[in-house]
From Swiss-Prot:
Record's function text: Catalyzes the hydrolysis of N-succinyl-L,L-diaminopimelic acid (SDAP), forming succinate and LL-2,6-diaminopimelate (DAP), an intermediate involved in the bacterial biosynthesis of lysine and meso-diaminopimelic acid, an essential component of bacterial cell walls.
Database matches in InterPro entries: ArgE/DapE_CS, Bact_exopeptidase_dim_dom, DapE_proteobac, Peptidase_M20, Peptidase_M20_dimer, Peptidase_M20A
Pfam families, per the entry: M20_dimer, Peptidase_M20
Positions bound to Zn(2+) 2: 101, 136, 349
Keywords noted in UniProt: Amino-acid biosynthesis, Cobalt, Diaminopimelate biosynthesis, Hydrolase, Lysine biosynthesis, Metal-binding, Zinc
Matches recorded under CDD domains: M20_DapE_proteobac
GO biological process, one term: L-arginine biosynthetic process
Entry-linked PROSITE patterns: ARGE_DAPE_CPG2_1, ARGE_DAPE_CPG2_2
Protein name: Succinyl-diaminopimelate desuccinylase
Annotated binding of Zn(2+) 1, by residue: 68, 101, 164
Catalyzed reactions: N-succinyl-(2S,6S)-2,6-diaminopimelate + H2O = (2S,6S)-2,6-diaminopimelate + succinate
Keyword Hydrolase on entry: yes
Amino acid sequence: MSLSPTLELAKDLIRRQSVTPDDAGCQELMMSRLAPLGFSGENLRFGETDNLWARKGNNGPVLAFAGHTDVVPTGPEKNWAHPPFDPIIKDGYLHGRGAADMKGSLAAFITACERFVANHPNHRGSIALLITSDEEGPAQDGTVKVVETLEARNEKMDWCLIGEPSSTHQVGDVIKNGRRGSLHGYLTVRGVQGHVAYPHLAENAVHNVAPALDALAKEFWDNGNDFFPPTTFQITRVEAGVGSNIVPGECLVHFNFRYCTENTAESLEERVVAILDRHNLKYDLQWHLSGRPFLTDKGALVSAAQNAIRTVTGRETELSTSGGTSDGRFIAPTGAQVVELGPINATIHKVDECVKAEDLDTLSEIYEQILVELLA
C-alpha cells in the first residue's frame, strides 16, 4: 500500500536516531525538500546543537514554523512492541520515537508547504522554519540562540506556529495560545550533623525544614485568571542523610513553580524567602527561571488556526495554556503571535509512542489551510 508524502517523510525522519542534541541528518533531509520550493537554508550550530533557519521570501509578513528534530531517549528497547527507530504503520497507527513529538508535525508542515507553494507560487510575505535539535534537553543552544541571532540582524517573525502535540482526543481539538512560566528553586538547609543517640548535640536539618516545606505546600499562590489555571508549587526532590545512625546536617530540596500571569518570578521568589525566614532557617537558595508565561490573545494567527481546523475537520477548537513549557517561551518575547498545534499527545515520551496515521495527513491539511488564511 502506498503511503502519503507526509507519512513517507515522517517515517524517514523517525529512522534517524536524533536523541538530544543529535540531529542525525534530519535537518538536511528537511532542507532537501524545502530547497526545490525556493527556500534558502542557514545552518546555525551552537555547541553540540544543530539549528536550521530556512526562509522563502524577503518581505513581510513572516509566518514561521518552529519545531525540533531531537527526541527523548527510548529507554530499554526490549520494552517496545516495535523497534523505536524502525517506524511501522500497524492497525492505522504510525509507531516510532518522535511520531507524535514531533517528527510527524515536521513532515506535515513540509508537505503542506509543498502543496501551498505549488498552488500559490506568488504568495505574499514569507514562510520560514526554525528547527532545532535541542528542545528536549537543556534548550540552551537551540531556539533561544537562533532567536538572538535573528533579533541581532532585525529579522522578525510576525506569526509563529509551533508543531508541539497539542491535541487531546482528536487532531485540532486543542491549540495552545500560551504557556505558564516555570521557575525552579534549589534549597540547601544547614543543621549540625551528629549521632542519632545524642540528638541534643546535633541539629536535624530535615526536622528544621519540614515545617517550612509544609507551609510552602499549603500556601495559596493565586486563583489563576481567564487564560491560565492557578499557580502550582511542587517539591520535586528531597535529599538528606549519609547513614542510618547519623543526624543529617544538611537537607537539599528542589521545587518547581508553574505560574500564571497573576504572579511574576520575582514575586514568587520574595514570597518563598519570606516563608523560609519565618522559620528561622539557615539556608542557601538558588533560582533558575526556565521561562516566563506568555499569551497570544485572539488575533490573526489564532483566527487562522481556528478557521483552518474548522474548514478541514468541521470542529471547533479549544484554546488552552495548560501543559509544560515549550520553545514558544523564547519566541513570544520578540512580539510574534505564537500558537502550538500538533497531533494527539497521549503517547509522547512513552514506550510505544505512536500517532494515528490519518491524523498526520489531516494535520498537513490544517497547516496548508493556515498558510492559505495568512499568505495566499
